[in-house]
């Protein structure tokens, strides 16, 4: 059964960015991931969104072992109908944060269809 309408999942992905090349483990409607720099990834849609008023949720950490410091993910650029960009930050000891690549980054994007 196809699901259409407002607030549906437009795209999702699970990626690995530790190796120096962002690798998509699995995804839906994500054609590629562009490594912009340490802790910065651009997720490119296979099919564009109808507008740039969509919501993105992210989480990151380690695939195996413990994630030793909290993480936060923030938009890194204005959303675009063709892609969105995030910045993955390591927040250790309540500092301002350091951009970090992680072995596990999950994103989900909900948008009008």
Q: What is the meaning of each model-derived region?
A:
Residues 1-50, 90-113:
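Extracellular receptor-binding modules and their adjoining Ser/Thr/Gly/Asp/Asn-rich linkers
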Residues 16-22, 31-32, 58-64, 79-85:
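Short linear motifs at secondary-structure transitions and domain/linker junctions
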Residues 37, 70-92:
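Ser/Thr- and Asn-enriched, surface-exposed coil loops between beta-strands
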Residues 51-79:
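Terminal beta-strand-rich extracellular "head" domains
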Residues 56, 84-86, 107-109:
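Hydrophobic beta-strand residues in large extracellular and virion-surface proteins
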């Amino acid at each position: 059964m196809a699901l259409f309408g407002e607030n549906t999942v437009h795209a999702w992905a699970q990626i690995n960015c530790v190796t120096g090349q962002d690798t998509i483990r699995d995804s839906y409607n994500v054609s590629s991931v562009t490594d912009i720099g340490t802790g910065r990834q651009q997720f490119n849609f296979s099919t564009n969104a109808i507008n740039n008023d969509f919501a993105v949720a992210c989480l990151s950490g380690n695939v195996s072992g413990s994630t030793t410091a909290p993480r936060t993910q923030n938009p890194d650029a204005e959303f675009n109908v063709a892609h969105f960009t995030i910045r993955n930050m390591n927040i250790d000891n309540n500092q301002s944060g350091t951009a970090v690549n992680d072995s596990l980054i999950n994103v989900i994007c909900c948008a009008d269809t």
